[in-house]
């Protein structure tokens, strides 16, 4: 195994470890928020309640910061993985060219030399296939669009948008349509995040309150910044500019479709056109 192959395996192992650590945090953050909310609703909180509230608030800030730090770390390691993949492909290409050059110089070669060349070629092909298999472990699926939303908005809007996009021939990642019994929901969600061309972010009051939705949004935001092209397609539903700015100022500058201005059919058509144009 070459130095680059070893490096790639090490980077991918580190990436998977960071992803596992990130996966644990949204649920922990949600539990802390609910605990804080329960205490805040008490009309006459006890001194014990107040101490618990202070402790929970500190833990919440710590875990939110940890999640943000892991997101940055994950983006960096993914960038390094892409660079290593490119360098590995170049290395393999150089090796193949060397083999081709040797074959050209030995058109009259003897059996021993030819056997050696063929053996080397087989070894390179085998290594190439092993690396491709390892690299593609996270690329098993490919979706045109990921629907990031709160489950509370699914029935009225999201499922209808999903069905109409599928009718247009697009491959859509909607949780209820891709989750399989017995499989990890978190791993499936992460695969969708990593392997979707675009994400439709259905911004609503429910979305803003959801810890999982925030995790999805931050993951796609890091992808958009790192990959330097548009990935996030926002839809506003019963939210104001102030609501969106408070959630994340990055979204305010993005042109968004508002459900008060566009029908479901119009929203679907505009999403479809963006995806189709990106493939041309």
UniProtKB/Swiss-Prot annotation:
The active site is at residue 216. The keyword Coiled coil applies. Its main location: secreted. GO terms for cellular component: extracellular region. Residues 22-94 form a coiled coil. It is found in: Secreted. Virulence factor that suppresses host Toll-like receptor 2 (TLR2)-mediated NF-kappa-B signaling upon infection. NAD(+) hydrolase (NADase) that catalyzes cleavage of NAD(+) into ADP-D-ribose (ADPR) and nicotinamide. Also able to hydrolyze NADP(+), but not other NAD(+)-related molecules. Able to reduce NAD(+) levels in host cells. This is NAD(+) hydrolase TirS.
């Amino acid at each position: 195994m070459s130095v680059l192959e070893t490096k790639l395996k090490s980077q991918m192992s580190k990436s998977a470890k960071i992803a596992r650590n990130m996966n644990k945090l949204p649920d922990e953050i949600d539990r802390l928020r609910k605990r804080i909310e329960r205490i805040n609703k008490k009309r006459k909180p006890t001194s014990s309640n107040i101490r618990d509230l202070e402790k929970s608030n500190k833990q919440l800030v710590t875990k939110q910061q940890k999640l943000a730090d892991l997101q940055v770390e994950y983006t960096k390691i993914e960038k390094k993985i892409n660079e290593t993949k490119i360098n590995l492909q170049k290395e393999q290409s150089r090796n193949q060219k060397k083999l081709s050059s040797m074959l050209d110089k030995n058109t009259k070669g003897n059996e021993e030399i030819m056997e050696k060349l063929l053996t080397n070629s087989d070894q390179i092909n085998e290594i190439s296939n092993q690396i491709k298999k390892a690299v593609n472990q996270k690329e098993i699926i490919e979706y045109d669009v990921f629907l990031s939303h709160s489950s509370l908005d699914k029935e009225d809007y999201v499922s209808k948008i999903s069905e109409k996009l599928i009718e247009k021939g697009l491959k859509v990642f909607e949780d209820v349509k891709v989750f399989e019994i017995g499989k990890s929901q978190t791993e499936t969600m992460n695969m969708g995040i990593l392997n979707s061309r675009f994400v439709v972010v259905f911004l609503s009051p429910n979305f803003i309150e959801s810890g999982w939705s925030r995790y999805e949004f931050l993951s796609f935001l890091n992808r958009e910044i790192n990959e330097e092209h548009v990935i996030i397609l926002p839809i506003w539903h019963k939210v104001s500019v102030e609501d969106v700015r408070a959630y994340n100022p990055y979204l305010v500058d993005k042109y968004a479709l508002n459900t008060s201005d566009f029908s479901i059919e119009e929203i679907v058509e505009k999403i479809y056109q963006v995806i189709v144009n990106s493939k041309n």
